[in-house]
């Protein structure tokens, strides 16, 4: 990837220091949060200061390394930790605590389970050596996600151009799957970036993505920063835009891809896939292999996170249409929906797109995997590097 292309940094890391871009404040303010404790990272994940399945997982891994270094200094001074096993126990308990922060995105649990396994089996017999193991593991996860982004970008852009058989393509997407959702460039939006860098992007159409408006606040923000041609549309306009604007492909990200290809992603993705099937527009899912979940047979086994009703019934009084939950007191909230004893609000964060609607294929760092013409459409457990 050429260094000439500068992308936003949602994660700022150097050894011992981790800062996360508070994405609730974008695009009006650019504020980084210091992560100095496990409570800090859990809060950042739960409150969606950091979001996007890959970014959540990487942030958790880096937070573990940063907090471990700080804790080692403090515990040594207080003579609380006396052996390497004392430190290991702290790290394992921290992983368990972070794992519960967001249940639907599989990247977080996969990364933390692997970290726990590596920490448990590490033979280091000093606290300093345990720390070095933790730091090396976290930095390896960080670097791997950047590499995954780059490879997904290249594979996806090349495939879409070949499929469309034209010089410049129109892409439709939902939510935010760019640099703000990953370690560097993005997955679905990374593919759009690559098309733009190569001069092959005609236009991007971005769904606003209610109720947190990740498309309007974040995807459009990334596009404006890099002068990527983009049109923002209401979520309810997806069928109309496919009918009237010559969309060549729909490309979305994922928070979990089950063994059969069923995909959990931002609420509204299922609607998008249904509309794409009707209009015969190829529908692609772009995600790193860390998002693949071969242990969950299908979408029925995915726990769908639900969030507070106020995300739908209230807007931030600070302006800009920012959505905020009760913890986001920096902006204040104003109710814009009538209240009553019989009013209920259903606010699932994700929906499940059946594998049968992923008509284009699944794009990972290993390549593009179209649906099979016979047998199961997808078998995630067999998606391995060629």
From Swiss-Prot:
Principal place of residence: cytoplasm
UniProt record, GO biological process: L-methionine salvage from methylthioadenosine; translational initiation
Keyword Amino-acid biosynthesis: yes
Alphabetized InterPro entries for the sequence: IF-2B-related, IF-M1Pi, IF_2B-like_C, Initiation_fac_2B_a/b/d, M1Pi_N, NagB/RpiA_transferase-like
Reactions mediated catalytically: 5-(methylsulfanyl)-alpha-D-ribose 1-phosphate = 5-(methylsulfanyl)-D-ribulose 1-phosphate
Transition state stabilizer (site feature) positions: 175
UniProt pathway: Amino-acid biosynthesis; L-methionine biosynthesis via salvage pathway; L-methionine from S-methyl-5-thio-alpha-D-ribose 1-phosphate: step 1/6
Annotated catalytic residues: 255
Organism of origin: Trypanosoma brucei brucei (strain 927/4 GUTat10.1)
PANTHER family assigned: METHYLTHIORIBOSE-1-PHOSPHATE ISOMERASE
Function: Catalyzes the interconversion of methylthioribose-1-phosphate (MTR-1-P) into methylthioribulose-1-phosphate (MTRu-1-P).
Protein's UniProt keywords contain Transferase: no
One CC-aspect GO term: eukaryotic translation initiation factor 2B complex
Name of the molecule in the record: Methylthioribose-1-phosphate isomerase
SUPFAM superfamilies noted in UniProt: NagB/RpiA/CoA transferase-like (SSF100950)
E.C. designation(s): 5.3.1.23
Annotated GO MF terms: GTP binding; S-methyl-5-thioribose-1-phosphate isomerase activity; translation initiation factor activity
Keywords of this entry: Amino-acid biosynthesis, Cytoplasm, Isomerase, Methionine biosynthesis, Nucleus
Record HAMAP family: Salvage_MtnA
Compartments where found: Cytoplasm; Nucleus
Superkingdom of the organism of origin: Eukaryota
Pfam families for this protein: IF-2B (PF01008)
Family: Belongs to the eIF-2B alpha/beta/delta subunits family. MtnA subfamily.
């Amino acid at each position: 990837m050429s260094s000439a292309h500068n992308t936003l940094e949602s994660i700022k890391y150097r050894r011992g220091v981790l800062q996360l871009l508070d994405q609730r404040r974008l695009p009006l303010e650019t504020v980084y949060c210091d992560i100095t404790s496990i409570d800090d990272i859990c809060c950042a994940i739960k409150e969606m200061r950091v979001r996007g399945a890959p970014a959540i997982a990487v942030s958790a891994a880096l937070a573990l390394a940063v907090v471990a270094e700080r804790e080692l200094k403090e515990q040594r001074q207080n003579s609380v930790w006396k052996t390497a096993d004392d430190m290991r126990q702290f790290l394992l308990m921290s992983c368990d605590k972070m794992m519960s922060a967001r249940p639907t995105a599989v990247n977080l649990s996969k990364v933390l389970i692997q970290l726990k396994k590596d920490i448990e089996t590490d033979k280091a017999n000093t606290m300093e050596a345990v720390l070095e193991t933790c730091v090396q593991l976290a930095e390896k996860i960080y670097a791997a996600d950047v590499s995954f982004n780059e490879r997904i970008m290249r594979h996806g852009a090349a495939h879409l151009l070949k499929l469309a058989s034209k010089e410049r393509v129109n892409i439709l997407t939902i939510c935010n799957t760019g640099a703000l959702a990953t370690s560097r460039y993005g997955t679905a939006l990374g593919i759009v970036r690559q098309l733009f860098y190569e001069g092959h992007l005609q236009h991007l159409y971005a769904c606003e993505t209610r109720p947190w408006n990740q498309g309007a606040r974040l995807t459009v923000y990334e596009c404006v920063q890099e002068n990527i041609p983009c049109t923002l549309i209401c979520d309810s306009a997806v069928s109309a835009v496919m009918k009237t604007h010559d969309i060549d492909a729909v490309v979305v990200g994922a928070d979990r891809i089950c063994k059969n290809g069923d995909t959990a992603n931002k609420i509204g993705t299922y609607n998008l896939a249904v509309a794409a099937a009707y209009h015969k527009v190829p529908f692609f899912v772009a995600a790193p292999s860390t998002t693949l979940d071969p242990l969950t047979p299908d979408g029925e086994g995915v726990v769908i996170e639900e969030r507070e009703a106020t995300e739908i019934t209230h807007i931030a009084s600070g302006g800009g249409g920012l959505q905020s939950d009760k913890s986001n007191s920096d902006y204040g909230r104003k109710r814009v929906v009538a209240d009553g004893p019989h009013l209920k609000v259903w606010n699932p964060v994700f929906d499940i797109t059946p594998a049968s609607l992923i008509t284009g294929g699944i794009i990972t760092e290993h390549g593009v995997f179209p649906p099979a013409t016979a047998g199961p459409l997808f078998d995630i457990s067999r998606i391995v590097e060629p």
